[in-house]
């Protein structure tokens, strides 16, 4: 094929492949210690339990569970999901829609609401996958200022007045990539601003259950009085990313539009996978499984934080209460991209923070993942990074 004769859609003009996916090609090398991804630990994936539940589901439903299903979702799962979401969010949930991973929920929201040139306010830095999704819909991305606790409501209101956005995208709990958690008073204020200015809030909360210290906080959705907050949830981090089951919860009119959009995207989320997650919920298996995951991840996070405490002066880092990530800031004269090249030579990988930032910048920041490494790998890999940073400072 003559590549010069291929005319791709303009929506791809400003969208490149995920930098993380490119790094994944590198971390596949034998012996590589990777702090780069966001994968669950293999120990956390309940393969035997999923197998047992799938066998039970097939025995109970026969071939029907392998047939096409309703876009709105597998009926038993809709029932258990509605109760699960209401209990988790501590508020009335008027409508839910199962989706094929919570990233699809963001895609459907953009498909339903965003025209080319519409403005979406975003935390900066933010989750790269959904930033790419917004760019594919040719949205104008405007960053909102943050501090050590996350998004600043005063700057949010100023940006709303200035840019008249259609949507705000936020990850309020153990944010990806920073690990920060938004305080309850800011969550309340965001909901108030959404209702006052009629801005849809996409509250993306896939790490909510991965809490190792501290107490749970109310969702932004729980403060929503007029239906402007859409909650995006996921079972990828607490059961399995391979099942590709997530959900969105919120205003019925938005759910209906997203359902229409889903019909032309994948028809429906796999019935068998919905049924397996349904059984996780109905049989009360989630609390014990989540507790087991949190025990493992909490230990690994503490170990990585302990290693960071021995890093050279000039290195600062977040101290999350949960989630999968720690965000570190190196001295300003150190390029994380250059550091990555040297680290890969020593069989250690991470993601430079600039890849998560709207408009670039933050060249001296890195995101570190601890969930998918062994304790020995954390000690060895962090020791290598410490030595590389010390060498760069000298």
Residue positions per predicted region:
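Conserved glycine-rich beta-strand-loop-beta hairpin in the small C-terminal domain of fold type I
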Residues: 278, 295-305, 316-329, 339
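N-terminal small-domain helix-loop-helix segment of the aminotransferase-like
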Residues: 11-101, 108, 282-283, 349, ...
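PLP-dependent enzyme catalytic core of the Aspartate aminotransferase-like
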Residues: 345-346, 359-394
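Short, conserved charged micro-motifs
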Residues: 334-339, 376-380
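Conserved core of the PLP fold type I
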Residues: 59, 64-198, 208-226, 297, ...
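Conserved core segment of the aminotransferase class I/II
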Residues: 225-295
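Hydrophobic residues in well-ordered beta-strands that form the structural core
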Residues: 122, 143, 201-203, 277, ...
């Amino acid at each position: 094929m003559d590549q010069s004769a291929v005319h791709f859609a303009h929506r791809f003009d400003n969208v490149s492949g995920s930098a993380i996916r490119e790094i994944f090609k590198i971390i596949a090398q034998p012996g590589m210690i990777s702090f780069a991804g966001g994968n669950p630990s293999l120990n956390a994936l309940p393969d035997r339990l999923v197998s047992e539940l799938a066998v039970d589901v097939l025995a109970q439903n026969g071939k029907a569970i392998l047939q096409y299903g309703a876009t709105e979702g597998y009926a038993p799962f809709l029932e258990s999901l509605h109760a699960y979401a209401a209990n988790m969010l501590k508020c009335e949930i008027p409508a839910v829609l199962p989706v094929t991973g919570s990233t699809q929920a963001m895609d459907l929201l953009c498909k339903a609401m965003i025209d080319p040139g519409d403005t979406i306010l975003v935390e900066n830095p933010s989750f790269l996958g959904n930033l790419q999704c917004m760019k594919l819909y040719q949205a104008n991305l405007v960053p909102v200022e943050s501090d050590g606790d996350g998004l600043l409501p005063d700057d949010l209101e100023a940006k709303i007045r200035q840019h008249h956005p259609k949507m705000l995208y936020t990850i309020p709990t153990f944010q990806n990539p920073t690990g920060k958690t938004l305080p309850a008073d800011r969550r309340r204020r965001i909901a108030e601003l959404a209702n006052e200015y009629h801005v849809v809030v996409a509250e993306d909360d896939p790490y909510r259950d991965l809490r190792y210290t501290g107490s749970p906080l109310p969702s932004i959705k729980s403060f929503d009085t007029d239906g402007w907050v859409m909650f995006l949830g996921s079972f990828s981090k607490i059961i399995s990313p391979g099942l590709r089951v997530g959900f969105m919860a919120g205003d019925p009119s938005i759910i209906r539009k997203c359902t229409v959009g889903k019909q032309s995207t994948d028809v429906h989320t796999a019935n068998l996978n919905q049924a397996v997650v349904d059984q996780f919920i109905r049989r009360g298996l989630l609390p014990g499984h989540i507790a087991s995951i949190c025990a493992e991840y909490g230990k690994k996070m503490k170990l990585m934080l302990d290693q960071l405490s021995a890093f050279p002066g000039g290195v600062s880092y977040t101290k999350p209460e949960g989630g999968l990530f720690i965000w570190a800031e190196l001295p300003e004269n150190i390029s994380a991209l250059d550091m990555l090249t040297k680290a890969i030579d020593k069989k250690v990988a991470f993601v430079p923070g600039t890849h998560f930032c709207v408009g670039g910048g933050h060249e001296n920041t890195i995101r570190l993942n601890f969930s998918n490494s062994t304790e020995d790998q954390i000690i060895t890999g962090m020791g290598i990074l410490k030595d590389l940073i010390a060498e760069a400072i000298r």
